[in-house]
């Protein structure tokens, strides 16, 4: 029972059957429309955010299983800030402000996938990401 795993990063609830996913699924002789529909259903709660998705395909039976990961840190931060995209020049152009509570909330959400051992270390990591995408925290850089 050979299996193939496909890992992709998609926009939540907005997957299209075109490249790069469509051709990959077609090579495995899967119904592309059905897979895309299931991915969109599974990622609907993360609409507008980039989300890692893993598709495990049984090559004999053509059955597939979809698992959705936690959205990227920058996507979670942008959603908290109400911003569309990160700053092209984060050192000089700030795009929004978030509270320290928002940073802690994102750190708690992402902690299982971070290498940080403590919540404090996770918060520092999230603060670094916030700075790199042009966010201020409690009106401070």
Curated annotation (Swiss-Prot):
<comment type="function">
    <text>Forms part of the ribosomal stalk which helps the ribosome interact with GTP-bound translation factors.</text>
</comment>
<keyword id="KW-0694">RNA-binding</keyword>
<keyword id="KW-0687">Ribonucleoprotein</keyword>
<dbReference type="GO" id="GO:0006412">
    <property type="term" value="P:translation"/>
</dbReference>
<dbReference type="GO" id="GO:0003735">
    <property type="term" value="F:structural constituent of ribosome"/>
</dbReference>
<dbReference type="GO" id="GO:0015934">
    <property type="term" value="C:large ribosomal subunit"/>
</dbReference>
<keyword id="KW-0699">rRNA-binding</keyword>
<comment type="similarity">
    <text>Belongs to the universal ribosomal protein uL11 family.</text>
</comment>
<dbReference type="Pfam" id="PF03946">
    <property type="entry name" value="Ribosomal_L11_N"/>
</dbReference>
<dbReference type="InterPro" id="IPR020783">
    <property type="entry name" value="Ribosomal_uL11_C"/>
</dbReference>
<dbReference type="InterPro" id="IPR020784">
    <property type="entry name" value="Ribosomal_uL11_N"/>
</dbReference>
<dbReference type="InterPro" id="IPR000911">
    <property type="entry name" value="Ribosomal_uL11"/>
</dbReference>
<dbReference type="InterPro" id="IPR020785">
    <property type="entry name" value="Ribosomal_uL11_CS"/>
</dbReference>
<dbReference type="Pfam" id="PF00298">
    <property type="entry name" value="Ribosomal_L11"/>
</dbReference>
<dbReference type="InterPro" id="IPR036796">
    <property type="entry name" value="Ribosomal_uL11_N_sf"/>
</dbReference>
<protein>
    <recommendedName>
        <fullName>Large ribosomal subunit protein uL11</fullName>
    </recommendedName>
</protein>
<comment type="subunit">
    <text>Part of the ribosomal stalk of the 50S ribosomal subunit. Interacts with L10 and the large rRNA to form the base of the stalk. L10 forms an elongated spine to which L12 dimers bind in a sequential fashion forming a multimeric L10(L12)X complex.</text>
</comment>
<dbReference type="InterPro" id="IPR036769">
    <property type="entry name" value="Ribosomal_uL11_C_sf"/>
</dbReference>
<dbReference type="GO" id="GO:0070180">
    <property type="term" value="F:large ribosomal subunit rRNA binding"/>
</dbReference>
<keyword id="KW-0689">Ribosomal protein</keyword>
